[in-house]
């Protein structure tokens, strides 16, 4: 079978979802028009491990319009939207994804998409890139892209160890990605996931945001806007100082764990909410992850110090600790915005996925010309994406005069 989804009968509903996303992704739809006419990806096979959402569907069908054959697997066992997966399968995309995959299912699906011998790898988190390298499956790969901070860190480590076998474009590093997707998109979708899972009031709560990168900045600002008192936990002195001057309290996790009501991780690192932190927490504390993998909260440790567990609501589990306190874990410690909600709004994914589509085209156009390194999105592409979005929104920006352009190039004239 050239696809494996939970229920193909959901395809009609999935198509409605995809069409709704298309309406809110005008920049990517503009690229699709060009791709459909020019077929820049004709004959190219793409293997993708991405969150299977309605927005991803718009990207995948844009690549298909450009002539590519795509095999898609989910990048998180709990983030796949089953109706969207069915809609894509019905439209000829090789989809191997469903919500609720086991770890075995997850890697089986990666193996399935690699049977198509892709020329381009698209990844969200770096698992696919790592898998093809560990299993010596890189010979036909022209290049790849990476969507996330976590994945870029892994790929940079591969580059430094000189084991990276093909060029990769770090879509995550584009201005039109991290300024909007990481900050604004994650900020809104994280709050959305927390509210869907808990239906609690944010105003008046003490919200602890662990990590103050672009994702943490976005989450902290949204909590603040909804009336929470926000505490930031950071290990970087620069980001800690920035958080302080943005108006947030800054302290260690040991201190924050004793006073927080809601804890959200956004670091991409291991056990930033540890067993010891959990034991310090208030009765009723809520834990959520918006980083990447389900390692930021020590879920194993939480289970070991619990005497009783029960599901209170969908995506909300109660753990009763030996000390009598109750701790509430959202989405099993996985990405709360994609498991308990639907991920980022289409409008911000429009920007990220324009970068993905144009980066794939760039890799194909420059086949054999790029080194086996991690590259940023070319600035011309980044700027093109911003201009496409502004045009779609009906926004005109100022153009410098010839005199102004000349002035900022010179060095002779000062005060």
Swiss-Prot record:
Substrate binds at residues 53, 124, 147, 177, 181. PROSITE patterns: ADOHCYASE_1, ADOHCYASE_2. It catalyses: S-adenosyl-L-homocysteine + H2O = L-homocysteine + adenosine. One of its GO terms (cellular component) is cytosol. NCBIfam families: ahcY (TIGR00936), PRK05476.2-3 (NF004005). Belongs to the adenosylhomocysteinase family. This is Adenosylhomocysteinase. It comes from Sulfolobus acidocaldarius (strain ATCC 33909 / DSM 639 / JCM 8929 / NBRC 15157 / NCIMB 11770).
């Amino acid at each position: 079978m050239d696809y494996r989804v939970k229920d193909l009968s959901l395809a009609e509903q999935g198509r409605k979802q995809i069409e709704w996303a298309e309406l809110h992704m005008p920049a990517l739809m503009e690229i699709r028009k060009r791709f459909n006419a020019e077929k820049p990806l004709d004959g190219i096979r793409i293997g993708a491990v991405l969150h299977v959402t309605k927005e991803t569907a718009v990207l995948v069908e844009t690549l298909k319009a450009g002539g590519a054959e795509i095999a898609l697997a989910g990048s998180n066992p709990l983030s796949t939207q089953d109706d969207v997966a069915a809609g894509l399968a019905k439209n000829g995309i090789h989809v191997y994804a469903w919500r609720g995959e086991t770890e075995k299912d997850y890697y089986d699906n990666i193996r399935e998409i690699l049977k198509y011998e892709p020329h381009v790898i698209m990844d969200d988190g770096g698992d696919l890139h790592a898998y093809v390298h560990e299993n010596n499956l890189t010979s036909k790969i022209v290049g790849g892209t990476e969507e996330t901070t976590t994945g870029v860190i892994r790929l940079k480590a591969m580059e430094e160890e000189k084991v990276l076998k093909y060029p990769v474009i770090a879509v995550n590093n584009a201005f039109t990605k991290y300024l909007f997707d990481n900050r604004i998109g994650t900020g809104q979708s994280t709050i959305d996931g927390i509210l869907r899972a808990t239906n609690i009031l944010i105003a008046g709560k003490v919200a602890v945001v662990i990590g103050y990168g672009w994702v943490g900045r976005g989450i902290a600002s949204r909590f603040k806007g909804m009336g929470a008192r926000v505490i930031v936990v950071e290990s970087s002195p620069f980001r800690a100082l920035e958080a302080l001057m943005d108006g947030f309290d800054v302290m260690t996790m040991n201190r924050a764990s004793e006073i927080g009501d809601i804890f959200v991780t956004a670091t991409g690192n291991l056990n930033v909410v540890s067993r010891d932190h959990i034991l310090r927490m208030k009765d009723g504390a809520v834990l959520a992850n918006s980083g990447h993998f389900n390692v930021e909260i020590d879920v194993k440790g939480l289970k070991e110090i619990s005497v009783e567990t029960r599901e209170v609501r969908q995506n909300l589990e109660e753990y009763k600790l030996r000390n009598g306190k109750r701790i509430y874990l959202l989405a099993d410690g996985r990405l709360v915005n994609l498991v308990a909600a639907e991920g980022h709004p289409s409008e911000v994914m429009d920007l990220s996925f324009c970068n993905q589509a144009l980066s794939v085209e760039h890799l194909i156009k420059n086949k054999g010309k790029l080194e086996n390194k991690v590259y940023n999105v070319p600035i011309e592409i980044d700027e093109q994406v911003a201009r496409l979005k502004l045009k779609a929104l009906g926004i005109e920006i100022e153009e410098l005069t010839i005199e102004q352009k000349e002035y900022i190039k010179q060095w002779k004239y000062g005060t």
